[in-house]
Amino acid sequence: MASQYPVGEVSTVLVDHIPVVWMEPSPRRPEAPLALWLHPLSRTKEDAIPFLQDLAGAGFVAVSFDAWQHGQRGTEVRDHILERVFGGFRRHMWPILGQTTLDALRVVDWAIAELEASPEVVAGGVSMGGDVAVALAGVDERVMRVASIVATPDWTRPGMHDLNDPSRVLPQGQADAYARWFYDHLDPLTHLDAYARGPAIAFECGADDTHVPPDGAQRFQAALSEIHPHVAERVCVTVHPGVGHLDGVRSAALLQNCMAWFLER
């Protein structure tokens, strides 16, 4: 992807307890727009660096961080994270989504204060990272645009199939009180009024994605249309034929779509 601006070096810092990575246009531009980009389950902030470079080249202060229990904040190898989470999805996934959403608030605060980024924020991510970005838009009015790839606003993920065995529907398990708190406060589909201000949200979905089915995004848009029709008009759900979950995770074309969505600001 061609860069409009020269890009500085990759920088890292601990923001409180949160390991952050960022890139900026070089030289730094005052009030450059802030872009937050988040990684999928079991990955790390380093996986976001190639797209951070593209975002910085497009003029954004581009930031990512390790999700809760991931990267520098984790103690498990990738396969163990996946095994634990999909062995008890609601008990383990909901706190990861919730804590990471709250951490995103802190990172946005830091980036605006310390990097002098604009308070008009765009946010996005892949799979779990996209889930978090959508949730963040429901609690942070600075987030004006969201772009998500193979992600969902429905944390219950009905019809979620095993990535390794698409014929198998994954059991959700039960949430404990701790996990339930995050769902009760942050799940986008059950907090539609949090989106009444009308952030522009793009869902890039795969028609063949049985792990994060596109109907979650479609139901979110339909539910918004019933109570906030003007808001639903700012939600764009694109279902790409022949694209499965892992196809979407790896897709350069979908990243380009997200970039175009951000640049419409």
PLM features per residue range, with description:
Residues 73, 218, 222, 226-265:
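C-terminal catalytic histidine-bearing segment of alpha/beta-hydrolase fold enzymes
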Residues 41, 207-209, 242-244:
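Acidic beta-to-alpha connecting loop that harbors the catalytic carboxylate
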Residues 156-224:
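The feature captures the conserved acid-bearing segment of alpha/beta-hydrolase catalytic domains
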Residues 23-76:
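Short, surface-exposed "cap/lid" segments of acyl-processing enzymes
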Residues 105-165:
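Primarily recognizes the serine-hydrolase "nucleophile elbow" in alpha/beta-hydrolase
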Residues 1-30:
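N-terminal cap/lid segment of alpha/beta-hydrolase-fold proteins
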Residues 66-70, 152, 243:
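Short beta-to-alpha linker loops that shape the active-site pocket of alpha/beta-hydrolase fold enzymes
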Residues 83-115:
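Alpha/beta-hydrolase active-site loop
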